[in-house]
């Protein structure tokens, strides 16, 4: 299972995450620019499943800012039944 790591020392706002996500998965520019589009990509057939997504350098005080992203990946992990693993590390 390949691990894709997103370093929140380098990600300040949600738009930065979308840009890094597009780059990491070699998606078409502009294919993810909001949570709905991200959900469609993650739960659709556009990612090389199975995979693990890891958020690093995301302390508790920043988790509120990125709470919607965390919730989306938590829900996608359930939806994809073992094909996606998601972890958050400080």
Which stretches of residues belong to each language-model region?
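N-terminal intrinsically disordered, low-complexity segments enriched in P/E/S/T
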Residues: 1-30, 43-90
């Amino acid at each position: 299972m390949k691990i894709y790591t997103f370093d929140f020392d380098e990600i300040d706002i949600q738009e930065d995450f979308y840009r890094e996500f597009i780059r990491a998965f070699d998606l078409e520019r502009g294919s993810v620019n909001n949570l709905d589009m991200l959900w469609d990509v993650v739960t659709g057939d556009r990612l090389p499943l199975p995979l693990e997504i890891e958020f690093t350098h995301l302390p508790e005080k920043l988790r509120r800012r990125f709470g919607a992203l965390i919730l989306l990946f938590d829900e996608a992990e359930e939806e994809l039944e073992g094909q996606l693993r998601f972890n958050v590390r400080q």
